[in-house]
């Protein structure tokens, strides 16, 4: 009987496959320093899924003031004694830095700030639906930050440049009189204050305005379409801030005006994403 009592039960040696059991997680260290983690889980359909992840550990070193680093290494005392380093969220509230400037008449300043805050709040409610619109390319950015402000004129100023050339300037110096006119103010001469070769530099820039562009268009696709005719220096595709989709127009800048003219001739009327492109030279800034 003693031998039978010492023997293990035969049922303990039998292995049963539990369908609900998952294999243990496996972690393998690779030669390049990364780790491969293999785990298992059940998906929404109840099937067992194997998940393999490759993890790379990156160490970020931060250089701080030695005195600040020394204070961080101090041992906590009082009610915080024995707690881990760093702020404890149950006793410490971390907020943004507030600059305190003491003043003698702080009550009057507080009342004035409260009054101004109410006016600003109402103005903010009035302008919350307003959007910034560029006067040059109609994009959602300020006109001063437009990438084409030096090469194009505003969209609404159609024909302004030609009208300015035909109409004589009002009050021109020496018009109809026999008085002496300086060379830089004579007809056909460069305007005062114009930098050397500024007019010719603008003539060398060749920028095309492409309209009727699909909202699914990408800058890389437009670059590939127009680079067949010459070197493209810049591609600007106007996008909506909220949806990040194209707004229907783009600007293509070429290094050579001849290439731009050939691209304008070939791509005007070209079918792209079920739409017919309209290509023309962008108006230069006056």
From Swiss-Prot:
The family this protein is said to belong to: Belongs to the eIF-3 subunit G family.
Gene Ontology biological-process annotations: formation of cytoplasmic translation initiation complex; translation reinitiation; translational termination
Region of interest: Disordered: 1-34
Originating gene: tif35
Pfam families given in the database record: eIF3g, RRM_1
Disulfide bond entries: none
InterPro entries documented for this protein: eIF3_g (IPR017334), eIF3g_N (IPR024675), eIF3G_RRM (IPR034240), Nucleotide-bd_a/b_plait_sf (IPR012677), RBD_domain_sf (IPR035979), RRM_dom (IPR000504)
Biological classification of the source: Eukaryota, Fungi, Dikarya, Ascomycota, Pezizomycotina
Protein name in the entry: Eukaryotic translation initiation factor 3 subunit G
Record localization: Cytoplasm
Assembly information from the UniProt record: Component of the eukaryotic translation initiation factor 3 (eIF-3) complex.
Keyword Manganese: no
């Amino acid at each position: 009987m003693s031998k039978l009592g010492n023997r293990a039960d035969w049922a303990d040696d039998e292995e049963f496959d539990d369908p609900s059991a998952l294999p243990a997680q496996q972690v393998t260290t690779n030669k390049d320093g990364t780790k491969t983690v293999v785990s298992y889980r059940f998906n929404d359909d109840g099937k067992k899924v194997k998940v393999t992840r490759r993890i790379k550990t990156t160490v970020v070193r931060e250089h701080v003031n030695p005195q600040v680093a020394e204070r961080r290494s101090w041992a906590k005392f009082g009610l915080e004694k024995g707690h881990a380093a760093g702020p404890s969220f149950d006793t410490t509230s971390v907020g943004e830095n507030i600059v305190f400037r003491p003043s003698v008449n702080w009550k009057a300043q507080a009342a004035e700030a409260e009054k101004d805050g109410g006016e600003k709040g109402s103005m903010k409610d009035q302008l919350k639906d307003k959007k910034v619109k560029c006067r040059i390319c109609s994009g959602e950015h300020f006109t001063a930050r437009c990438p084409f402000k030096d090469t194009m004129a505003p969209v609404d100023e159609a024909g302004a440049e030609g009208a300015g050339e035909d109409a004589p300037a009002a009050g021109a110096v020496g018009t109809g009189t026999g008085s002496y006119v300086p060379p830089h103010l004579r007809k056909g001469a460069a305007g005062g204050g114009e930098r050397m070769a500024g007019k010719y530099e603008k003539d060398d820039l060749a920028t095309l305005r492409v309209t009727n562009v699909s909202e699914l268009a990408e800058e890389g696709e437009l670059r590939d379409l127009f680079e067949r005719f010459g070197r493209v220096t810049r591609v600007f595709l106007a996008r909506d801030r909220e949806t990040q989709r194209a707004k229907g127009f783009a600007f293509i800048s070429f290094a050579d005006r001849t290439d731009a003219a050939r691209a304008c001739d070939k791509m005007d009327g070209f079918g792209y994403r079920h739409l017919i492109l309209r290509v023309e030279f962008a108006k230069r800034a006056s």
